């Protein structure tokens, strides 16, 4: 049985491979009234992120996770992959939003813990175990989620730098100086040029620079002055644009529409990695040459949630079944002490490289947990765990 939500995953986690039954959860669309006292809501697994955001907003609250695929991504899939997204810096990922779950085990047993108590020290936190389990342990059918304050006042700025290192240094300076910082996104001059050219967007600055940061602040009071003051203190900043409310969406488009523009070049190999803070700049600067060594002529497109170390690596040029560039990048990530999967999960696409991050003892533990909850191997049998030797 392969559980399936909005089909926005990028590692094949909800794709049947050998005649499995697809279990669509899209019709589990129940939404409870928002519990204003607790700041929580109970939702069905098939509710889209956009619908959840609208529901929370109507109650004067917000949901802490946001994704570019908000119109299609569903709550169940986001929990199953422990999605991160644009505001991880401020609110964390899906595991941090889950107060309780309802799920169905492989034998049909329904387990439910949706009371939403903030403190409940009564045994194993099985709900958090299911976050990131990719449908291998149980089928998530509903969730109790925490909501966050709706920060109506926002400030967005696009910052340009001559060097990647300067942009990375600026992130840490802004994190220290700006309490209201909600997002910090990195992309490169090559990516910005591609987005503007392929999607007919105006260039934000007269000249193209090597690296850009898109930063957003959010608060009850207007954070524009706080952000502007911090930006004024940044070293090696070569240009900046602080958006008025009418231009915020355009500045975000330069970052959010990267995948759309890259797809117009050709089918990309998509990698989603995390680096230690001290190695991010080195990775961004070196990975194109790492790719070129094994795939001459390939193009590397880099962007991501830099404040939490998450870089998306898109590679165009190699054939879909040519994994030499994937192998080279993921091995390089591991050599720097990073993770081969930041937020997309392992699925079928990355399980061959799980050993780069997880020891044999850890993989054995994973198998033991899987065997305990799904002894017949019914649930999503071909994802996450490497094929048995």
What are these regions (language model features)?
Residues 1-389:
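Noncatalytic alpha-helical scaffold of FAD-dependent oxidoreductases
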